């Protein structure tokens, strides 16, 4: 027979468990909103630095906070501009909302700062009329068999990274047209971005344009998981998900897990 004391203890235990769960959920939400957020990359515009279906760890605090960087609050105009703002650095890989489509997120490399003059001539970046250091270091063949020339580029602040250009035969097939551009003058408060996959990136050279600082969400840091194929898809049934589990596991790119996005020691 259950006594009143037993019932009271049971109720207390249930309440304690509920409050513990609520506390854990609140902490997780705060971390997601203020500290870090994972992102999945759906396109190859940053190939081969970042591949399709790479899962990226990014830090929210790197540039401070704006309406667009605070998860779950980006639809509420809490304030203008950024709070606790920290200036981005040339060469950062940034997650942001493109001004021409605020419903999606892009990830690109920051090349031009406010006040900069940017131009590409024969695939070489010129910043304020000075070309950056660019050296061909090898080739890269993607998982779908497309071959790229691989270059090591050094920005004026000393930041180095790899960029990729379609090999000549593929350049003809995919209509390479981004290697020579007009001159871009970066306005105050805005930034110029490029994809590391230079011939296959929708960036500031084409439709994207300049990106306001307010649109920055986070700074990408490293890859925490990576697969060649997606397992989850809202358009397929449960049985198909079960059938896709084995090939999905086999498609995990173990060599990319915990890869630092700023490491050029290859």
Curated annotation (Swiss-Prot):
Cystine pairings recorded for this chain: none
Protein's recorded name: Signal peptidase I
Entry EC no(s): 3.4.21.89
Residues spanning the membrane: 21-41
Signal peptide region: none
Cytoplasmic topological intervals: 1-20
GO biological process assignments: signal peptide processing
Protein's organism: Rickettsia akari (strain Hartford)
Gene: lepB
Enzyme class: hydrolase
Keywords from the named record: Cell inner membrane, Cell membrane, Hydrolase, Membrane, Transmembrane, Transmembrane helix
UniProt similarity note: Belongs to the peptidase S26 family.
Membrane topology term: Single-pass type II membrane protein
